[in-house]
Every structure is written in structure tokens, then in C-alpha cells.
């Protein structure tokens, strides 16, 4: 882990929705930032088509984009992210976007930021079509770079049976020391985090929180 912090001072995170950063990489990002890394988070959409409106509901279809934008800003602040970019794509439409446009947008970020490490979703193994399409766009953009100029790409994967296809994660991080930042990031997404498929509305004790959220796992993408 020390090697990650010292080697990767410019990190780019590319996810499609607010809260993807929270559950996937908030602890590791907080750790890297504390170690001196500069993190740019490019969030493709505002998750405006999400079905969760809070528990009990306090948002609606009209104001959800504004609320989720604010939640995203609060989440990034909780992690310590220095540079938050909202790219303005439409939620649940990433798979239908012009691939050339996605590649150009991400390629421009690569050219501007020169990251040495990128976090995204593993295309084909991250359940949601927006996740898969986002990860695929990142891989295409990085693949266009000369091999010796490509940043490392750490991917999150969690589809059913993914380990049979891509093996076990090769990057496993104990982020338990950064659970306060991670949980603050999760809880910033007030419209979302109590959904049954996420945290749920039950109270979690410290042992349960550490078990569920204290470890973050990634797959290094292997370019051919």
C-alpha cells in the first residue's frame, strides 16, 4: 500500500454515478490522498434516473438531480478528493452514447491530467450497463496510448461468477483505518445509502461495518 501512495501521485477515478466512489474505493482514495496523492474524480452522470428517493422519500423525479449533485459534492469532500468533475452525460444511457465521444472525453482527461493510476469498473463484470460502458470507454482510451505511457488501471468487479472469468482480485486493500471517511462518503448519499441492496435501514455495529466496508478489492486490467 505504501508503494501505491508513493508511486501514484496523480490518480483519476472514472465512474458513472454518484455513490459509485463511496462503495468502491472511498477508503483507498482517502488513504492515497493522506499520503499526498492528487485525485480527480470524473463522474459521468448525476444518477438522475435512480429509483431511490430517500428512506422515507424526500426527493422526487424533478429535484433528484440537484440533490444527487449536492450529495456527490459532500461525498467527495468527505473523502478529500481535490478535483471533482461532473461530465453531464445522461444516467442509464452511457451504453448508448457515441463511443467516439466517450473516448474523446476520457482521452482529454488523460492528456490533461497524466494520471499514473485510474480506477473504474471492469467492463463486462460490473452488473450495471452504465458501469460496463464506462469501464469499456476507459480501457479504449488508455489502450490508444503508447504502451509505455499507459497508466495502471484498477477495476472493480462484482458480477455473478466474475472470479471464474477473470480470477481473484490482485489488489486487496485493508482500508479499515479510513472507515470514518468511507462511511461519511456513503452517508452523504442520503437518497441512496439506506436502500436494502446497499446499507439498508438497520443499524450496523462497528464489527459489521468493518466486515462489510473495511476491505476494497480491485483487478489490474491486463492490456494485450
Regions found by a protein language model. Name each.
Residues 1-12, 83, 92, 96-224:
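Metal-dependent de-N-acetylase/amidase catalytic core
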Residues 1-113, 144-147:
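Active-site rim/loop-helix segments in enzyme catalytic domains that contact anionic ligands
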